[in-house]
Amino acid sequence: MLGNLKPQAPDKILALMGEFRADPRQGKIDLGVGVYKDATGHTPIMRAVHAAEQRMLETETTKTYAGLSGEPEFQKAMGELILGDGLKSETTATLATVGGTGALRQALELARMANPDLRVFVSDPTWPNHVSIMNFMGLPVQTYRYFDAETRGVDFEGMKADLAAAKKGDMVLLHGCCHNPTGANLTLDQWAEIASILEKTGALPLIDLAYQGFGDGLEEDAAGTRLIASRIPEVLIAASCSKNFGIYRERTGCLLALCADAATRELAQGAMAFLNRQTYSFPPFHGAKIVSTVLTTPELRADWMAELEAVRSGMLRLREQLAGELRDLSGSDRFGFVAEHRGMFSRLGATPEQVKRIKEEFGIYMVGDSRINIAGLNDNTIPILARAIIEVGV
């Protein structure tokens, strides 16, 4: 039977990672995979995470199952981190998941359980795995305009016009902050206009919050999500702990379902636990316990916030350096968008041919749509990238 399987196209980003590893050149630069790296190219374990694990090692007495929906302390801590004072526990269902991707998948499954004819609106462009998962599930996908290729900013008028076509029973996937792959983000005033459109259409928002703390700060990065939560009666939020806690391999994520009333919350919580049971039963515990320990221990939380702020400000500094280098080489401000974008990524606007030349001639690897991982740069590689960008004619 297994001989009937068809070959699957490899994930382009993961294939690029393999190609980079096979490249024998000493000066090669990896700007492809979306993983934070420090100035030495290392993805470190955060100090507070180390300390939390040490506490767990000393105090844990069992490895038995936790609940189907996850550890209550983790659920509460994540709800408060994301929604702040706006968290309404009596109407919020919470699910621990296998990473942010698991949260996205369970959110889609939950919405499809509620509406078998679910249609999903996604930004053009979006994280490729969004569409891949939806296609695999057989869900109809509709794109809405988002990125302006000329300004490298948000095409907000196009976005509004396209989202106005959504209907009650549709889902609208929004990036909570640090848009992947473009780095172009909505202002709070623009979030308010999106909320007005959602109020009119009755569409269900699903907010992908994978990079809270990587853009303008923990509170600032959650502002759009909180605004939507304050105005729309039903909201799904898929959050990842991979980036802001640096626990990529622990696969720690969370799904919040904001409901109109307590009775609906009970229905959603039961359905979400059911989905976990049908998929993998109990969610991973170790990463969730790390997160809850950090967030509920004042000294660990303070140290985590300080280290996360250093990561965030470091990426902003790299953005400003790259934009400045490109300004000097080009004699113009046409690359100013690099400094304005937020998060790990920026889309440069290079053609596939230019991306290929940059890889072949300079040993610099980026995704085919010219998305670069800002965190993959350092003081030494920024001038090399800037020169490559100018020389290939971006």
UniProtKB/Swiss-Prot annotation:
**Is the Transferase keyword given for this protein?**
yes
Species of origin reads: Paracoccus denitrificans
Keywords (A to Z) from UniProt? Amino-acid biosynthesis, Aminotransferase, Aromatic amino acid biosynthesis, Cytoplasm, Pyridoxal phosphate, Transferase
- Superkingdom per UniProt: Bacteria
Cofactor(s) needed for function: pyridoxal 5'-phosphate
EC number of the protein = 2.6.1.57
- Give the family this protein belongs to, as stated in its UniProt record: Belongs to the class-I pyridoxal-phosphate-dependent aminotransferase family.
A Pfam family the protein falls into: Aminotran_1_2
Q: What is this protein called?
A: Aromatic-amino-acid aminotransferase
Q: Which GO terms describe its biological process?
A: L-phenylalanine biosynthetic process from chorismate via phenylpyruvate
Q: What class of enzyme is it?
A: transferase
User: What do the Gene Ontology cellular component annotations say?
Assistant: cytosol
* Functional note: Shows activities toward both dicarboxylic and aromatic substrates.
Where it sits in the cell: the answer is:
Cytoplasm
Which residues of this UniProt protein bind substrate?
Answer: 34, 65, 127, 180, 371
Subunit (UniProt): Homodimer.
Residue numbers carrying N6-(pyridoxal phosphate)lysine: 243
Asked whether the UniProt record includes Transferase among its keywords, one would answer: yes
Q: What is its main location?
A: cytoplasm
Name the chemical reaction catalysed here. an aromatic L-alpha-amino acid + 2-oxoglutarate = an aromatic oxo-acid + L-glutamate
MF term (GO), any: pyridoxal phosphate binding
> Sorted alphabetically, which InterPro entries does this protein's record hold?
Aminotransferase_I/II_large, Asp_trans, PyrdxlP-dep_Trfase, PyrdxlP-dep_Trfase_major, PyrdxlP-dep_Trfase_small
